[in-house]
Amino acid sequence: MIEESKENSLKYFLIQSVASVIFLASILNQSFSFLIPFALLIKIGAAPFHMWLVSISKSMSWKVLSLLMTFQKIGPLLGLAMLSSVSHLSWLMVNMSSFLLMLVYYVTYLAILYFAVILLQQTPMYSLAQMNSNAS
């Protein structure tokens, strides 16, 4: 268990470091500025760059995972909000009209995620197949 925790910590560190290097390199070199959103999406763990989050979250406790899924996303989400355009997620465009609306959205996201984590922590399910068998 400790070895797996060390491995996941190293994976997280390396992926976040690579994303930070891509982000900084794309800021310094204007010809690669199109890579800024990609670096931020890697840091958030958004699709199609989400596979690192899935592999790391397998062995995490729910408390640590909830921190990873909430507070670690604040910086990159704000960075994406500053780059927002019609092609980005629609809720990011809300930030252009009202910071309060974005704050309400994020607090709602935190509350939903918190209750989902609490529910999943108290239920001994480890796959979607178990969820389906418990429903019948």
From Swiss-Prot:
EC numbers, comma separated: 7.1.1.2
GO molecular function terms noted in the UniProt entry: NADH dehydrogenase (ubiquinone) activity
Transmembrane segments: 12-32, 34-54, 74-94, 99-119
Protein's membrane topology: Multi-pass membrane protein
Keyword set, alphabetical order: Electron transport, Membrane, Mitochondrion, Mitochondrion inner membrane, NAD, Respiratory chain, Translocase, Transmembrane, Transmembrane helix, Transport, Ubiquinone
Function: Core subunit of the mitochondrial membrane respiratory chain NADH dehydrogenase (Complex I) that is believed to belong to the minimal assembly required for catalysis. Complex I functions in the transfer of electrons from NADH to the respiratory chain. The immediate electron acceptor for the enzyme is believed to be ubiquinone.
Protein name, UniProt field: NADH-ubiquinone oxidoreductase chain 2
Organism for this UniProt entry: Artemia salina (Brine shrimp)
Localisation per UniProt entry: Mitochondrion inner membrane
Example GO BP: mitochondrial electron transport, NADH to ubiquinone
Catalytic activity entry: a ubiquinone + NADH + 5 H(+)(in) = a ubiquinol + NAD(+) + 4 H(+)(out)
Entry annotated with the keyword Transmembrane helix: yes
Enzyme class: translocase
Family statement: Belongs to the complex I subunit 2 family.
Recorded GO CC terms: mitochondrial inner membrane
Keyword check for Electron transport: yes
Principal location class: mitochondrion
